[in-house]
């Protein structure tokens, strides 16, 4: 379990040799992989590199450390921010935690919390709260790529009275620089990917634990599981959740069977996990849309109930894969002028979000989408996992991540490099259908306008459009939200009652009007975004 921490720094904080200097959640990779080595590695990095220590530490983590050398507390997380770190400054001192729910409960004992208008509209627009904002005032998040410092009195852990938290940028997304041939780029991707797999799976192997590896119909989790298997990590437990007999289910099942892995499937038919609002909010603090977490929470609970928890390792995912080796952009154009709301799932409240000061400043559209949708968004989709075990994706590996983002878009767009790497190095992995295209990745593509897809994919998309309108209305989609809301009347009725029962906890009239409008008139995605806020209101402001 990724143990969380909470720390209160005030005038009562004393210098005590027994007082912990390091508070930490997550893990770093070390050669021997024992707790003593891990602790020593982190402390040595912080003593030698200070605020830049995360650039020396591989893993998924967040923490706070008192440096007696610099007389300051250092707040830090891994460069890609896979573990969030939250803080608030109150009259009685600093409150800092990796656990949003715990932090809120501690602050509630001192003062009430209110909704942050910016955080509120970010969640309704994107499905997650972004950058340094959170859903509730006065809590902030340490932004990704930054360390924070709070000055202390000389040789004391007590903060200097009236001190502020200073943030220091230590990591930026790399700019496109290297120009390699497709073959050379694929060769380097393979070296870096295998090194990342070895680090992560060796951690489980050294602890004699069974790696949990997610599988779906996509390429990202497939390559994580496949290459780990090829490298000798064959004792895997593949887990999959999807509508029964959807392509995600069928493809994942076939791969797990062919590799002779253990297999755990959880059907999502009926959408019942949409009712797990309260359980998920306890893990997320309402800072990310709840429904994506509900599947993970339920399937991990099922697996724990069937196995000894002590034998289970990390959850290995393919998180961020197709936007690292591929790209968020589908063409080779990477504009420097773009909408602040580019990448949002709902554009209903663009004006309100901009009026409340939402002004992300990234130098191009790919960086904007990678930071907001990828690092601040998709990464938050694992918050429910951390309550049970740790999680890692080989695509988080900073060497692989930086290498790929430096490659020109002509190599990465439309999965050009991704499919080349698979077909050249792992041709057997290309024998399975890719859920996104409904055909194999070796199928010839046909360009119509700016889009290039296999003919079979064009035809399937046309038929789906005529028959269902949206993929989320198709019962054979992995998570068909709109289909569930339309057909599962009992679930929809319970969610409607939940929404209406707690709506008045949004005490600001305009915000209350807007969230009701989104829930009443929105599509499935917009409805669950609205419900995520309501669940947080129930838990934190009632």
In which residue ranges do the predicted regions lie?
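Cysteine-centered catalytic environments shared across enzyme families
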Residues: 1-271
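Residue-level signal for cytosolic alpha-helical hairpin/rod architecture
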Residues: 39, 398-401, 512
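Short alpha-helical segments and helix-capping/turn motifs at coil-helix boundaries
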Residues: 48-51, 60-61, 131-135, 294-307, ...
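Short coil/turn segments at secondary-structure boundaries
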Residues: 56-59, 133-141, 204-209, 386-387, ...
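Short, motif-level signal for alpha-helix interfacial/capping segments enriched in acidic residues
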Residues: 59-60, 374-378, 468
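ATP-dependent adenylate-handling active sites, centered on carboxylate activation for C-N bond formation
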Residues: 69-72, 89-91, 152-153, 172-432, ...
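PAPS-dependent sulfotransferase catalytic core
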Residues: 334, 428-520
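Charged substrate- and nucleic-acid-binding regions of tRNA-handling and nucleotidyl-transfer enzymes
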Residues: 526
């Amino acid at each position: 379990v990724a143990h969380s921490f909470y720390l209160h720094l005030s005038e009562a904080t004393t210098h005590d040799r027994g007082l912990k200097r390091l508070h930490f959640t997550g893990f770093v990779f070390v050669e021997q992989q024992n707790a003593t080595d891990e602790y020593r590695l982190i402390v040595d990095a912080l003593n030698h590199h200070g605020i830049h220590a995360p650039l020396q530490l591989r893993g998924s983590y967040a923490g706070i450390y008192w440096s007696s050398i610099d007389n300051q507390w250092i707040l830090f997380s891994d460069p890609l921010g896979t573990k969030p770190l939250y803080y608030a400054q109150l009259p009685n001192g600093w409150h800092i935690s990796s656990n949003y729910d715990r932090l809120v409960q501690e602050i509630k004992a001192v003062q009430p919390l209110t909704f942050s208008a910016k955080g509120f509209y970010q969640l309704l627009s994107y499905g997650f709260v972004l950058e340094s904002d959170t859903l509730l005032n006065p809590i902030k998040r340490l932004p990704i790529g930054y360390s924070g410092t709070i000055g202390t009195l000389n040789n004391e852990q007590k903060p200097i009275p009236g001190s502020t938290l200073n943030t220091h940028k230590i990591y930026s997304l790399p700019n496109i620089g290297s120009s390699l041939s497709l073959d050379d780029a694929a060769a380097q991707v393979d070296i870096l990917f295998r090194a990342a797999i070895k680090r992560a799976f060796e951690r489980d192997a050294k602890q004699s634990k069974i790696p949990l590896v997610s599988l779906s119909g996509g390429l990202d989790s497939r390559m994580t599981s496949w290459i780990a298997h090829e490298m000798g990590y064959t004792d895997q437990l593949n887990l999959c959740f999807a509508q029964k007999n959807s392509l995600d289910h069928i493809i994942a099942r076939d791969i797990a069977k062919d590799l002779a892995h253990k297999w755990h499937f959880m059907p999502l038919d009926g959408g019942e996990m949409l009712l797990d609002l309260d359980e998920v909010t306890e893990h997320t603090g309402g800072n990310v849309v709840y429904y994506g977490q509900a599947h993970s929470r339920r399937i991990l609970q099922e697996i724990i109930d069937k196995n000894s928890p002590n034998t289970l390792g990390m959850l290995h995912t393919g998180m961020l894969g197709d936007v690292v080796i591929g790209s968020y952009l589908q063409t080779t154009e990477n504009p420097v002028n773009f909408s602040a709301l580019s990448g949002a799932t709902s554009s209903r409240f663009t004006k309100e979000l901009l009026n409340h000061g939402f002004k992300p400043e990234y130098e191009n559209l790919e960086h904007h989408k990678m930071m907001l949708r990828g690092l601040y968004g998709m990464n938050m989709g694992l918050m429910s996992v951390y309550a049970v075990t740790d999680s890692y994706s080989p695509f988080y590996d900073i060497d692989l991540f930086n290498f790929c983002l430096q490659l020109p878009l002509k190599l990465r767009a439309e999965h050009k490099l991704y499919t080349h790497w698979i077909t050249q190095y792992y041709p057997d992995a290309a024998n399975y259908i890719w859920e996104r295209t409904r055909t194999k990745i070796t199928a010839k593509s046909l360009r119509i306008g700016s889009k290039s897809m296999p003919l079979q994919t064009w035809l399937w998309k046309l038929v789906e459009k005529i028959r269902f309108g949206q993929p989320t209305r198709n019962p054979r989609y992995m998570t068909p939200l709109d289909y569930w809301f339309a057909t599962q009347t009992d679930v929809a009725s319970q969610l409607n009652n939940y929404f209406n029962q707690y709506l008045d906890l949004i005490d600001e009239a305009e915000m209350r009007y807007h969230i009701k409008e989104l829930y009443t008139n929105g599509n499935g995605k917009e409805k669950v975004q609205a419900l995520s806020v309501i669940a947080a209101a129930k838990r934190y402001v009632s």
